[in-house]
């Protein structure tokens, strides 16, 4: 079952994101107490309060606000039904949404919760228009996520140094044509 994410969910989101970062599924910096991680989680708090995240536009360098609807996942069965065990955050793009961040608590993996949560996320209004998913290429859970995305109609269309970019097969043709300009440039190092 999904519930809209709110600022009260920040502790569980922070925990799941830090765990995912330590496994290589998200930027590893997010697993640290760095200035960048503090800024990210401050922006995430704002997004959970307002629905918007502040970030730098990769094309112009300007700061911009981006719609970031999100959900937490509670299992329909089991002892953890009273607390979220997973989450999904979408980020608005020019033509729809990117499934931006998603994860399931490690203790609950391997029991179908990732598939159930992804199905529920993709049935939400932003999920129905979530045409892009970027997956860290070398995370310990990346192969499982890539397999899961394939089963939901996504295909690998581009790889950067750090990410595999998956595009849903029913994405607007214009999005596929503009994909390279939309993908943020990755710095070396």
Predicted regions and their residues:
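Glycine-centered loop/turn motif at secondary-structure junctions
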Residues: 129, 150-153
């Amino acid at each position: 079952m999904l519930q809209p994410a709110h600022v009260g969910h920040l502790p569980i989101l922070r925990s799941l994101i830090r765990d995912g970062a330590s496994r290589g599924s998200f930027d590893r910096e997010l697993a640290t107490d760095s200035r960048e991680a503090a800024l990210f989680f401050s922006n995430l708090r704002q997004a959970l309060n307002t629905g918007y995240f502040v970030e730098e536009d990769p094309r112009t360098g300007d700061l911009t606000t981006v719609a970031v609807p999100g959900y937490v996942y509670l299992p329909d069965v089991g002892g953890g039904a009273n607390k979220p065990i997973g989450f999904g955050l979408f980020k608005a793009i020019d033509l729809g949404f990117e499934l931006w961040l998603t994860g399931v608590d490690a203790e609950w993996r391997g029991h179908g919760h990732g598939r159930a949560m992804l199905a529920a996320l993709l049935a939400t209004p932003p999920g129905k228009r979530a045409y892009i998913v970027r997956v860290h290429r070398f995370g310990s859970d990346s192969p499982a996520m890539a397999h899961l995305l394939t089963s939901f109609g996504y295909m690998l269309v581009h790889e950067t140094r750090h990410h595999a970019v998956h595009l849903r097969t029913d994405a607007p043709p214009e999005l596929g044509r503009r994909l390279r300009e939309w993908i943020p440039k990755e710095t070396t190092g």
